[in-house]
Amino acid sequence: SFAKEDVAGLSLDEERERIERTFSGLAELTGTRPEGWFTLPRTGDDYPGGSVSEATGELLLEAGCGYFGNSMADDIPHYWITDYDRRHTLLMLPYYYAMDTQFFMFFPGVGKGSGLVQTRALWENWAAELEGVRAWGRQSTFVIQPYLMQFGAARAVLDRIMRAVTGDPDLWSATSGACAAYWKQAYPADRTLRFEKAAWLDEE
């Protein structure tokens, strides 16, 4: 998300502007408009799931977003019903912070109990996750923060995971966009979802 700010404190128009500024800025830099959206947590947050507001899902759809990249609800993609009455959905891809490099490099921040660099723990998590993915055929997202993975032990761990993933014929190494495209074709929302009011919601 733009500047990793907490969007829960923004107005609807402010959040809409931030989303468009992010998509447009990345399109200008790369020549391609992003297909999806990640609201990754900040290392100083008390919560690990990033920041969304009640309007985020609908605003992302309005901006042409094809998927939301960091949902911790499952280890397979699933659909977020952003507007029940209008049957609006946004595809959610798996994310878990134990697979995110930022929580193993100078986290918490220096002066806040930092564990400094925990590359061995990061590799143990990644290696165990690969075993689980092979065994059960699920999806896992490895989040690599390039600025944290440039040198020494961190670079060695990055090289190791890249070799492990790309060298295994039983694993499909794909971008989030490719994963989203596959899931939407194999399990389209209009054929796989059964819209029902949640039992715990009060009926008007």
Regions picked out by a protein language model, each given a short descriptive name:
Residues 2-5, 38-41, 56, 124, ...:
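Active-site beta->alpha N-cap acidic-glycine motif
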Residues 6-95, 101, 149, 153-157:
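Catalytic domains of cell-wall/extracellular-matrix polysaccharide-remodeling enzymes
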Residues 67, 73, 79, 120-204:
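C-terminal domain-boundary segment and adjacent tail
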Residues 2-14, 106-111:
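Surface-exposed, active-site-proximal loop segments in enzymatic domains
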Residues 89-128, 134:
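A conserved mid-domain beta-alpha-beta active-site/ligand-binding segment of alpha/beta enzyme cores
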Residues 7-11, 114, 118, 171:
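Pocket-edge positions in alpha/beta enzyme catalytic cores
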Residues 1, 41, 97, 146-148, ...:
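Short, flexible loop/turn elements at secondary-structure junctions
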Residues 1-3, 36, 137-143:
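Glycine-rich, often proline-containing surface loops adjacent to acidic residues and nearby aromatics
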